[in-house]
Amino acid sequence: PDASSLSLQSDIKLRDYQESAVDSWLKAGGEGVIVAPCGAGKTVMGLAATTKIDTKVLVLVHTRDLAAQWGERCQQIVGVDATLYGGGKKDDTGRIVVATFQTLERMRWAERYQWAKQFGMCIVDEAHHVPAATFCSVMVTIPARYRLGLTATPDRPDGLTDLLHWHLGPTVASIDTKMLALEGQVVAPRIEWLNTGWKPKKEGQEWVKLITEMTTDDDRNATIVNRALAAVDEGRQVLILSDRVDHCLFLANALAEYSLQAVAFVGSVSKKKRAEILARANDREIDVICATTVADEGLDLPGLDTVMLTTPSKALNRVQQRIGRAMRPHPEKKEPIVIDLVDEPRSLRGIARKRLRLYTRLGCR
């Protein structure tokens, strides 16, 4: 490939592992996936790759929050104003165009293919979503010669990981969390197991009913609230994660009654309000954020030091994404902790043991 008219801003210096990952992608012919944990600088590596090839670039994301983040980072890292194609805007005039999968999926197949022919390179952020039907239908119509996938968690529990590589190429670089922790690029959190003592009224319930009963249990919720209060008393900022919107709303209200600055960060919160919450949280004006899966990706809070996992997850890649929120280094940050709730049923303790193996692999204490 020719040298690109894009270049890194003078204050951006790639770390050795970032440079090595981009070089590996180039040597693989400009196709492949870079696997890197939260805090490793996936966006920096993606944009560094764009400086190696002189072509128009399409960045594909699956949320408006991520689209906005890429827009900001393009200006900071390569000094280019990216244009946005999605979320109500349809501007494809930029040297770099950031588009949402959902917007492209609404185009007719032939129309999308003709539109995408203007791009010589395609970057997919959170690339582990590519095997999903909606994203696959978009990817087959993107003819870009150069392709780069970025993800912390390429392995899918549904066994469709091969589809990711079919669309984007092999894994060309895999950056190890333990190595990053040794270099001080991420901070491995301490794991605190919090026994709730909770057990369901009857054994053998289906998963959805089990989670409903768990998240509406008064004693269990009191345990969560009390531990969050103690963390805030220690000067910590807490992210409480739950799979249920109602649970997040309940916990935010319960904590607000103790005069804490507690907010719910859920799907129904507007884009403008989310940006406002993140800005206030980064200024330490918010004590506790209670969030659903919308926080799994695209939640940018470098100063966050405490994550509470309040609903059990069988998807280890999702757990890894979630604890990654606390692993970014920050000068004013306390030792990060992940508070993992453990309940009484044997099945849930079995899932907790799988999480323990993940934590060990990631170098958590």
Task: Describe every region a protein language model picked out.
Residues 51, 55-106, 262-264:
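Conserved nucleic-acid-binding Ia/Ib motif block in the N-terminal RecA-like helicase ATPase lobe
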Residues 261, 267-362:
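Conserved RecA-like P-loop NTPase helicase motor core
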Residues 87-121, 132-137:
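Conserved helix/coil segment N-terminal to the catalytic DExD/H
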Residues 1-35:
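Conserved pre-motif I regulatory segment
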Residues 68, 81-93, 109, 239, ...:
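Conserved helicase ATPase core of P-loop NTP-dependent helicases/translocases
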Residues 120-121, 128-192, 359:
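Post-DEXD/H (motif II) to motif III coupling segment of the RecA-like Helicase ATP-binding lobe
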Residues 28-53, 290:
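Walker A/P-loop
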Residues 202-243, 249-254:
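Conserved interdomain hinge at the start of the Helicase C-terminal
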